[in-house]
Amino acid sequence: MKHKNTVEPHDRMKLLNTERNTKMAASAHAYVRGSTARFYEWLETSDRAAIPEGPQAWICGDCHVGNLGPVASTDGALAIQIRDLDQTVIGNPAHDLIRLGLSLAMAARGSDLPGVTTAHMLERMIDGYEAAFTPETENEAPGASDNMPKSIRLLMREAAGRSWKHLADERIEGIAPTIPLGKRFWPLRQDERAAVDALFAEEALRRLATSLRSRRDDAPLRVMDAAYWRKGCSSLGRLRLAVLVAVGSGKAERHCLMDVKEAIAAAAPRSRTAEMPRNNAERVVAGACSLSPFLGQRMIAAQLLGQGGVHPRVAAAGLETGNRAPVARRGDGYGGVLGSRC
C-alpha cells in the first residue's frame, strides 16, 4: 500500500541530501548547527590567537544549543545534559566552549537581540562552566541544583509531563501498534527489515529493552514494526531507524520504541595520546556514559548490515518531536542502538 508523503528506499538519498542543504540554508544559526566539519576547518585556518589547551577529556565535539536539553534516566530522574554525542571524542574542552558560544551568538543574532544581550549570554556560559569546578557542585546530583533558572525549571516540568502515552499517540497507530508511514517514517528495504529482526534477536539488545520495561532478562521480545526515521540535520542521509518492540507476553506485554542510528567518524579533533574505542559506535557510547550518563545508560553499540557501528538507544538521544523535550522515564519504554561504519 502506497502511503501519502512517504518515500521509497531508492529515492531516500536524493531527498535527504536536498533537505539537509535546505535546512542549513534556513538561517545562520541552522548553518552553524549543521556544519560541524566546516567549523573545525575554520578553527584550523583561523589567524586569530591560538586556542588554549585544556585538560584532555571527553568532549561533545558538536556542542550547540540544539544538542542540550532534558534527558531522563532509567529510573525517572531528569537533568539537562548533552543529547547528541555523534562527534564525541577525548579532546580539548575549549572546542566545546567555542562552538557553544558561536551557537549562542548566532541564535541571538537570528532573534535580532542587541549585542549587549549576546555578551551577557556568553558571560553566563563561561560562569556556568567555571561553576562546575567549585567544590559545592562536586557531589551535586544531576538536575538537583537549587539555583536553576525559572525558564529551565519550566522546561524540566514540561519534559517530566511527557509520557510514553503522549509519544505513542504521536508515533504509533492502531490496536496492533505500528509505526505510521508518512513524512517522518519511511518504508524499509527487505534486507534492512531482516537485519533489524536479526539485531533484536541478540542478547544485548534484549537486556536493554527488558531493563527499560522492568522485565526479566529472559522475557520474550519481538519486533512489531520498523521504519526509516527521517530526523536530524547534518546527520540526514545516515542510516537511522525507528523500531517498535514488544517486551513480555500476555497482559504483561509492554512496548519500547528504539532509535537505531549509524555512527560515523568524528570531525572533532581528538587527543593523539588518549586511548578511546576505535569503533565509532563504541566511541559514542563511551562518550555518552562519561558526559551524559542518563543517556549513556540507555545506549549500546552493535552492528547492522555489515556496518561496524550502530548505536541502539532506548530513548537514547531521546525521541523528541521538533523542539519538544525528550522523555524516557523508566517504564515509558524508550531505547536506542548505535552503529558505526568501520
Which residues make up each language-model segment?
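Conserved ATP-binding subdomain of kinase catalytic cores across diverse folds
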Residues: 1-60, 65-160, 213-342
